[in-house]
Regions:
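Short beta->alpha junction loops/turns
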Residues: 34, 184, 249-250, 273, ...
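ADP-ribose/adenylate-binding Rossmann-like module
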Residues: 203-206, 242-243, 247-254, 258-283
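Segments forming oxygen-rich coordination pockets for charged ligands
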Residues: 1-207, 211, 215-220, 224, ...
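Short amphipathic alpha-helix with an adjacent loop that forms part of the alpha/beta core around
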Residues: 229-239
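A generic structural signal for alpha->beta connector loops
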Residues: 199, 220, 264-265, 291-292
């Protein structure tokens, strides 16, 4: 069962387009409210699974104290509408299956769903409406889906069709960020673990066979032994969003940087102090000029940590901020300005 947030007002934990999954065995994947509403959603999801209906909408309003359940003590001051959509073997697990395939192949994709009937379509950069349920609103859904594919994001809107006025929810799927770790030493393990927890696709490479042990890393990570000179042949660097060079070997790090300098990887992190960065830059010569605008060294945010886990957190946090076009500033400063001391 898929649960999509299709609309919000006021303050909510997540916004329109967020997705959570429920299984017939009462397993949950993801969060929509931070834990406040998931139990009720699960109850309704299981009822829907046992019924002949394809979808249902639940609304949760915590904006006032009149509501005896959702308005008592939550303090969120927001309204959330959630579309529950039956996704099972009978539907081929659509539309999620097509969105997942597109994400894995790094194609842009979107889906449009009729909120009342559960009819849907999926469009990708390679096709329009390839995965679609039968229904009288197919043409309207394809139009909305194509628009969402072009614009991105998520939206719910009313649309006039040949069969009346319909509420259509549409959302564009985003591919998982891809992270390349050049160096599979012990300190790469927490970096891979944090990134995997965020849902990133992680590849770890090393030129030393003794370090190439997939058992040390999360199950879905790729761990590959490489000849640094042919790294670009082993790994499709065009599909890498961020790379971190962390082999702890000066010559090897320089060779990794030389390969990445020829690539278009937008974020290249380098572990180690500034003096080491400058020495490597000098050895790179003219290649350093192309790398400089993309080089984050020393890698990571200044969080004050010294343990491998704290350093890994600072690295992944900086990459997360970079991928979202943020600077990694505190929310208190972003939303309220600097706080004056009392």
């Amino acid at each position: 069962m898929a649960a999509f947030i299709i609309g919000t007002e006021g303050s909510t934990y997540r916004k329109c387009g967020a997705l959570m999954l429920f299984s017939a065995g009462a397993e949950r994947f993801g969060l929509l409210s931070g834990g406040c509403l998931e139990g009720d959603l699960q109850d309704h999801a299981l009822r829907l699974l046992a019924s002949r209906e394809r979808c249902a909408v639940r609304s949760y309003d915590s904006r006032g104290s009149d509501d005896p359940v959702w308005g008592l003590g939550l303090g969120c001051e927001g309204l959330m509408r959630v579309l529950l959509l039956k996704v099972d073997e009978h539907s081929g697990y659509e539309p999620l299956a097509s969105l997942l395939r597109a994400s894995e192949s790094r194609q842009a994709a979107a889906t449009a769903i009729d909120v009342a009937s559960g009819e849907f379509t999926v469009c990708t950069t390679a096709s329009i409406g390839r995965a679609a349920s039968d229904g009288q609103n197919a043409s309207a859904l394809e139009t909305v889906c194509a628009q969402r594919l072009a614009e991105g994001g998520a939206r719910t809107a009313w649309l006039d069709t040949l069969h009346g006025r319909r509420e259509i929810f549409s959302v564009a799927a985003e591919h998982a960020p891809t992270l390349l770790l050049c160096g599979a030493g012990p300190d790469a393990e927490p970096v891979a673990e944090f990134a995997a927890r965020l849902g990133w696709q992680v590849t770890i490479v090393d030129h030393r066979s003794a370090y190439v042990d997939a058992a040390r890393f999360p199950a879905h990570c790729r761990v590959i032994e490489v000849d640094i000179a042919t790294l670009g042949e082993k790994i499709d660097l065009q599909h890498i969003d961020a790379a971190v060079v962390m082999s702890h070997h000066l010559t090897a790090d320089g060779r990794y940087l030389a390969v990445l300098a020829k690539s278009n990887v937008a974020y290249v992190g380098l572990l180690g102090p500034a003096a080491r960065r400058e020495r490597l830059a000098a050895e790179l010569g003219d290649r350093a000029a192309r790398l400089r605008p993309r080089l984050y060294a020393p890698v990571g945010l200044d969080l004050g940590g010294r343990t491998p886990e704290a350093i890994a957190l600072s690295i992944v946090a900086e990459i997360q901020a970079f991928l979202n076009g943020r600077r990694g500033a505190p929310f208190s400063a972003v939303h309220q300005g600097s706080l004056s001391p009392v």
